[in-house]
């Protein structure tokens, strides 16, 4: 067969192979969560684990029950809300709070950055083998989050948490939170991002506690939302001192301002 005819005969097969390779290269290896999301409106989701005090019917240990009762005394019948005084929601609170506040995901191969509009709170999930050594991880409200892919599901383990006594699902510094993120579509074709969290904490709970929240795309923006939380912690310290002294637990934010003025 003449050389030119062989080339013409092979050309369609080569073109098909190149096209297939191009499509494969264009397909992402994992789902991309990048975008702004808001609470899914397709179905009721129940109580979230944000601020507002501990939920009822939690499988509490005796120590967990004691801590819950202590916190309820600290916040009083008016149920003081730490979120209203600028304390970070942390994990899982910022992931599971319902309402109109959007949440933004920015995804890179080795990191998922999540920004909650309230307080412009940020958490980072580090994906893959490149991780901070355990001895260098500092406890925080959001903890340290280490992620890996299991197919199309991002699996995350969050540790190094500060005490979350004020959460709807409270936890101690010993808590480990296992999380899962994945995307699907509902019957109407709406894209749905599902967040699942399992709290394992032998101090508070006799068994794991699970949280599920769902999000849908939000056609809007994350807006600036600055706030400082020092006043909240000072108020809580005042009330804790009253509790330990057996005094009425009635400190108010005005008392915090007055104490600050006296120190100046």
Segments predicted by a language model, with ranges:
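Bacterial N-terminal signal peptides that target proteins for export
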Residues: 2-14
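N-terminal signal peptide c-region/cleavage motif recognized by signal peptidases
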Residues: 20-22
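Hydrophobic small-molecule pocket/channel-lining residues, especially in calycin-type beta-barrels
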Residues: 2, 24-264
């Amino acid at each position: 067969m003449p050389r030119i005819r062989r080339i013409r005969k092979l050309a369609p097969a080569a073109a098909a192979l190149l096209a297939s390779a191009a499509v494969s290269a264009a397909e992402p290896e994992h789902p991309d969560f990048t975008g702004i999301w808001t609470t899914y409106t397709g179905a009721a989701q129940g109580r979230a684990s944000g601020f507002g005090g501990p939920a009822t019917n939690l499988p509490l240990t005796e120590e967990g029950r004691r801590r819950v009762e202590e916190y309820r005394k600290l916040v009083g019948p008016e149920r003081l809300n730490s979120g209203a005084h600028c304390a970070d929601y942390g994990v899982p609170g910022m992931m599971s709070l319902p309402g109109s506040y959007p949440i933004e995901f920015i995804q890179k191969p080795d990191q998922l950055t999540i920004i909650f509009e309230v307080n412009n709170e940020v958490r980072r999930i580090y994906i893959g083998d490149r991780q901070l050594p355990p001895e260098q991880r500092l406890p925080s409200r959001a903890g340290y989050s280490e992620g890996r892919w299991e197919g199309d599901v991002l699996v995350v383990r969050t540790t190094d948490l500060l005490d979350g006594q004020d959460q709807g699902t409270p936890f101690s510094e010993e808590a480990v939170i296992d999380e899962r993120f994945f995307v699907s579509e509902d019957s109407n074709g709406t894209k749905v991002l599902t967040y699942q969290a399992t709290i394992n904490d032998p101090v508070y709970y006799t068994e794991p506690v699970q949280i599920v929240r769902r999000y849908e795309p939000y056609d809007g923006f994350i807006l600036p939302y600055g706030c400082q939380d020092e006043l909240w912690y000072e108020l809580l310290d005042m009330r804790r001192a009253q509790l330990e002294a057996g005094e009425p637990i009635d400190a108010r934010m005005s008392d915090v301002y007055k104490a600050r003025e006296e120190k100046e």
